[in-house]
Every structure is written in C-alpha cells, then in structure tokens.
A protein has these predicted regions:
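A composition/biophysics-driven feature that prefers long, compositionally simple stretches
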Residues: 1-199
Length: 199
C-alpha cells in the first residue's frame, strides 16, 4: 500500500468515525468481538456512536422523502430514533410515540414516570422533548375522552412552529382513531413503514 494511503488510513483510525460509515475494519481490531459489559480499561461497544448512527440513518430516510416529519408508533422505531426503551405491556399498547422532524432532535411522548426517567438518564435527548402523554391504549380509552385530539393538536403546533404545517407527515403504524383525527385536522398522512425499515 502506498505511504500516502497508509497515512490517510492511519489518520482516519484515530479520528471520530462519521455516523453513517459502519466501523467494520475487522483487520485492525485488537478484539474481534467486543464484550457488551462496559469497563474503564477498554473501549468496547461505543453506544454514543451507535445512537448517532441510528439517528443519522433515520434522518437520511426522512430527507429522502417529501415529509416534514416522521410520526413513529412502532416501538422499535421509537427506540431506533430516540434511543429509549420501555419494556412490558407498554410496548404494544400504542401509547408511546415519537416525532422526528427535520431539525434532527426527536420528541418522545411516554407515560409520566418514563418521561421523567428519560430526562434523568437519556442526556442525548433534549429534556424539553421528553413529554408525558397518553392516548387510547388500543381503544381502552375512548376517542371521545379527547386525548387523541389533544395529541394531534400538539403535534400540529410543533409542525407549525417548525414551518412544516403544509408538509405531509409520514407514519409507520397508527390506530384508526389517531389517523382519522390527523385527517380531520388537515394533516396529510403518508406511509413510511418501508422507509424506516430501510433505515
């Protein structure tokens, strides 16, 4: 290999890798398979870089569409973009959701104690973007209660503040009542399930 190429590669090894470039240079790894338990004496899984990589991929998917934002209900997509996770029954009740806008700083709505937890233990999130919220729990709370209408109004306000009120919103998974409320408030909804799977 020419000296110039070696020098360039050497400089890249010691610099911070760009978010969208996978770290797959196995030939130069001292440890082929890094352990998952963090220790002070080795760099193992770089979770900071993992979070940046995931969000960058999701942003790349968003920017490839005409959408002003992605509204995410699939809890794996919520984890992928916000790096937050709540186990148990909350996963399939459609009560957690995230909004990824073109500024790259996602919003997350969660039940109250979880929203507080994210503010304490997820410093990569803007604290003002971790919201307490509740929707319909897959029909257990009737739409007439007004929680869905309030949530859509809040989302519409955030889009207006970002200058995106006329842009379509991509949704990966949605309850009918939420979809109908978005349409009633004049929001154009498009399917971005495959876009997020590609991210």
């Amino acid at each position: 290999m020419p000296k110039a190429a070696k020098s360039a590669g050497h400089a890249h090894d010691h610099g911070a890798p760009r978010p969208l470039i996978p770290a797959l240079d196995f030939a130069n790894r001292q440890i082929p398979a890094h352990g998952t338990m963090a220790v002070d004496f080795e760099q193992r899984v770089d979770f900071h870089r993992l979070r940046e990589y995931r969000l960058a991929r999701a942003m790349q998917a968003l920017e490839a569409t005409e959408c002003g934002a992605f509204l995410l209900f699939d809890f794996y997509n919520i984890r992928y973009t916000t790096q937050t996770w709540i186990g148990g029954a909350q996963g399939d009740k459609m009560s957690r959701y995230a909004l990824l806008t073109r500024d790259g700083s996602p919003h997350i709505w969660d039940f109250g104690s979880a929203a507080k937890h994210h503010k304490l233990f997820a410093p990569w999130l803007n604290p003002d973007h971790s919201h307490a919220g509740m929707l319909g729990l897959r029909g257990a709370i009737h739409p007439e209660v007004g929680l869905i209408k309030e949530a859509v109004t809040t989302i519409k306000g955030l889009l207006h503040d970002a200058g995106l009120e006329n842009a379509p919103i991509g949704v990966d998974l949605v309850e009918p009542a939420f979809l109908f409320e978005m349409q009633a408030q004049g929001i154009e909804v498009v399917d971005i399930q495959q876009d997020m799977l590609g991210a």
